[in-house]
Amino acid sequence: MGRPGSQPNEAQPPPVQVQPTVNRDNQVHSQNGAIGQANIQTGRPVNNQTQNLWSSDLFDCMNDSENAVITCLAPCVTLGQIAEIVDEGATPCATGGLLYGMIFFIGVPFVYSCMFRAKMRNKYGLPDAPAPDWITHLFCEHCALCQEYRELKHRGFDPNIGWAGNVQAQQPVMSPPTGQRMMG
């Protein structure tokens, strides 16, 4: 039937589509809050991927108190674990930790550690917040490492078992069929 006063086959106007807006910095802001870069020639977004947020704040170190203590006493261990997962096994934990330890004694560990934060951000679409990676690591080195460790755990990785252990843990367990008999 329909609404009173309306005709059964009355044509409905098409829904209004809101086009994303492009600001002066060539960033596209869509209705759902996604931010991407605009193609200057066409004005269309090149990468309309939404930007994810960090799963925890920079100063939430005690959300994982065991990692906070380890990072406080031996940040090279945490950095090694992060490096192995972020680089998908290309940088073993021991190598990443040893390099970090050597650079730590020179007094500029943030130079090495901020690279892995940048890789993680690019890989998972995380914002460069609360400050650029190098500033975050320069002034809040231990907190930044803890946040990155927690982020990997939040995304389903266990940094303690390394890249190979995580790959193996994600493989489906196959069990042999039971109760098969020959028909004959």
UniProtKB/Swiss-Prot annotation:
The chain crosses the membrane at residues 96-116. It comes from the Eukaryota. Residues 1-21 are annotated as: Disordered. It is found in: Membrane. Its main location: membrane. Residues 1-10 have a biased composition (Polar residues). Keywords: Membrane, Transmembrane, Transmembrane helix. It is a single-pass membrane protein. InterPro entries: PLAC_motif_containing. GO terms for cellular component: membrane. Belongs to the cornifelin family. May be involved in heavy metals transport. This is Protein PLANT CADMIUM RESISTANCE 4. The gene is PCR4.
